[in-house]
Amino acid sequence: MEFRGDAYKRIAMISAHLQPSFTPQMEAKNSVMGLESCRAKGGNPGFKVAILGAAGGIGQSLSLLMKMNPLVSLLHLYDVVNAPGVTADVSHMDTGAVVRGFLGAKQLEDALTGMDLVIIPAGVPRKPGMTRDDLFKINAGIVRTLCEGVAKCCPNAIVNLISNPVNSTVAIAAEVFKKAGTYDPKKLLGVTTLDVARANTFVAEVLGLDPREVDVPVVGGHAGVTILPLLSQVKPPSSFTPSEIEYLTNRIQNGGTEVVEAKAGAGSATLSMAYAAAKFADACLRGLRGDANVIECSFVASQVTELAFFATKVRLGRTGAEEVFQLGPLNEYERVGLEKAKEELAGSIQKGVDFIRK
């Protein structure tokens, strides 16, 4: 079979990235056309995005959604298993982003080199009866290894950390970056967007509104009582009865458990988490592009409280979280909830710090 011009080289290059045995040396041998050679004709330059844990429950759906994002020009999909299959599947979508797959520890550095945004959903999922802290022993080591790769290969990338428990893994990542001398607190972002999405959805149900018209600030952390919806600051301005406040707060805090139990051992909140992760990643990319007033909630290094990390609204820009907003006025219910959240968060953050320092 004959191909015109450089078509054969392009096809060979793309095919190489669908094979688990791919190496940079193979790319150099198969093509002299460079990294951008198989970008869609006429496509915008866009950004280079890596998903670490792309073959997992969250990762597969997230890979699909990021392939659809017009701001992505190059999408690297990394995992320790099944990365070639996910890469092949997603690569058949006729959108502009070029997809490249990477399999196993030996290819981690290649997956990360030159990335603008790194999204990390890697780790084991929650199962019935498990808390996010039950995941710590396994996921802590995974996050450490991946962040060591980030520090070495793309130290200037913005990192979106999804791996649970986020209240601890963000601290782990920070300590890894500090050891490597690459830590920039503005660029390490714990993803809490699903808490906001749930809050918007559940509040909209109570108010009889479209969730897209509702904005609920959710502060604190990303587990149980550390998730604190500020219902007094809901937009559009609304009032709730004490029973509604109790119902909404409890449901938002336990949204993950609701899904785990509903799936009866068949998984966790992978679909809604992938949606939330893609939404937050898109906000980060718009910030990188220089869009004005890109505001989302995120678990970040913060001086809002005495804790080293705290989830609040942040303004995203070219350097990451360029502004961290204060909490604003709280009612008595929220002030009590804040103290409970801080007490729980302090231990979780310290657990992450100790994992690296001890």
Curated annotation (Swiss-Prot):
Residues 1-38 form a transit peptide. Its EC number is 1.1.1.37. The active site is at residue 222. GO terms for molecular function: L-malate dehydrogenase (NAD+) activity. It catalyses: (S)-malate + NAD(+) = oxaloacetate + NADH + H(+). Substrate binds at residues 126, 132, 164, 198. One of its GO terms (biological process) is malate metabolic process. Keywords: Glyoxylate bypass, Glyoxysome, NAD, Oxidoreductase, Peroxisome, Transit peptide, Tricarboxylic acid cycle. The keyword Transferase does not apply. It is an enzyme of class 1 (oxidoreductase). It is found in: Glyoxysome. GO terms for cellular component: glyoxysome. InterPro entries: L-lactate/malate_DH, Lactate/malate_DH_C, Lactate/malate_DH_N, Lactate_DH/Glyco_Ohase_4_C, Malate_DH_AS, Malate_DH_type1, NAD(P)-bd_dom_sf. NAD(+) binds at residues 53-59, 79, 139, 162-164, 273. Gene3D superfamilies: Lactate dehydrogenase/glycoside hydrolase, family 4, C-terminal, NAD(P)-binding Rossmann-like Domain. Homodimer. Belongs to the LDH/MDH superfamily. MDH type 1 family. This is Malate dehydrogenase 1, glyoxysomal. The lineage of its organism: Eukaryota, Viridiplantae, Streptophyta, Embryophyta, Tracheophyta.
